[in-house]
Amino acid sequence: PPQSMGLVMEVHEVQLTEQDHIEYRMLGDLPYIIIEREGCKRLFLSGVTGDVLHQSIREQSHEVFSRIAKVLETEGMPVSSIIRQWNYIEKITACDATGHQHYQDFNDARSLFYNGVEWTTGYPAATGIGTQWGGIMIDVDALLCKDGSVRVLGVDNPLQIAAHAYSQNVLLGEKDVALPQKTTPKFERAKAVWKEDHGFVYVSGTAAIRGEQSLEGVGIEQQTLTTLENIEYLVSHDNLNRSGIPATENATLITFRVYVKRWEDMEKARQVVTERYPDLPAIYTLTDVCRSELLIEIEGIGVLC
């Protein structure tokens, strides 16, 4: 529940079959989990940080992505096998003395990491969220199925411009010197995993954005409602089918993670969410989001059938 301080935990369950084999592995000081069966491998890697927290956000981002790349290479999994990514960015909307915004520096580093990769099923689902300290930290869920038994598809939302297609108008700060211009946030609005007649969908961090513009000046209740409407349309039966997922109904949302910028808005946001989803497990955290005018961001997981 919302509290002024303390620890909150979210637990994800993975159902294993008789064919699945699970291993806990290490690469240097990085622990990770592999679930594998013939023709299919899944990787869970979390808490990847840089070695030097006083380095710039740009330097830390490049280092963290380099460490992730080494794990993927060790496991024989391409960068494009990443289906979900959680990106925790210290003081996400802050700018340094040279005019570089933390979030933009991270996005430029991510673009360079993704460069040259064939994203045939779309970019990963992702959340980019602020922290008070800690530099850059990334969690990754990757899936590689060579036997064709599982389909992985990016899901777009017609209510919003794809984040990776944003114009320069909504990108702040200075660009990376290695790039011709500032680069966009490389993620899909959702990522679906489908097998035979069922699956699940990772809903990316979603906010009160229509097109590429934030909904400003309306207060936390309206931003929360608009965010939920964006998610509901995203995982609707019609939109899933439009994205190539043969779901027969809307995705059933099974969990939310709610990021609220201001403590005084926490209870108001909770009331809007619980009124619409009274039985849905949700955790609430006090944290900054990727635009200064946005007051809330919500991510989730849904079940497909």
Please place each PLM-identified region on the residue numbering:
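N-terminal presequence-like segments and the immediate start of the first folded domain
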Residues: 1-86, 91-305
